[in-house]
Amino acid sequence: MSEKRILIFYGTRYGATEGVAGRMAEILRENGNQVEIFNLKDLPDDKIPEFSNYDGIIIGSSIKIGQWTRDVKKFVGNYSKKLNEFKGKLGFYVCSGYASDPDNYEKVKIDYTQKACEKLGVKKLDLYDAFGGLMDFTETSRMGWLEKRILKTVGQMTTGEKAEDNSYHDLRDWNQIEKFTLEFNKRL
């Protein structure tokens, strides 16, 4: 199998989506591919690589209050025509705390990937999935005080358990992420 060229674009708020993008890049490189990874927040439009030079594109976004990051939404909306015309494989994923709940998983997967892409004009998704997120209540968390308080309250209402101050909960299923990435690699 010859080396494939893959782009990974992501938008992250608290680091969950960034961590997934990094792990996907590692897996794809371990399988003999060349991977370029970009946080859309730091990527000006004039620096976006030409899609036709690549065999695959994966796009990831965190979900907060039912919304993608602003940068991913703008990117997908602005490049929907090019993404639909892209000859390679297109993958999409989201990271959301709700996706870690088996009762919500399918709804999150469909609503925040396939349906959300369709609303922005992207009809071509070869593979998509939803992964859990992070609940980081440590002092070094990217979350602000109010966000931590809201998440703790919502978490206690839904699980009946109180999240401790300075606790860290990784709700991502790394086996699921590896399976998604290997399936994407196989489809290239």
Question: Which residue ranges define each predicted feature?
Answer:
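Short amphipathic alpha-helix with an adjacent loop that forms part of the alpha/beta core around
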Residues: 46-53
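Short hydrophobic segments within beta-strands
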Residues: 9-11, 38, 93, 131
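FMN-binding flavodoxin-like domain, especially the glycine-rich phosphate-binding loop
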Residues: 2-3, 19, 30-31, 53-57, ...
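A short beta-strand-loop structural module common to alpha/beta enzyme folds
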Residues: 31-44
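Short, charged N-terminal beta->alpha structural module
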Residues: 8-29
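Surface-exposed, flexible loop/turn segments at secondary-structure boundaries
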Residues: 14, 43-45, 98, 136
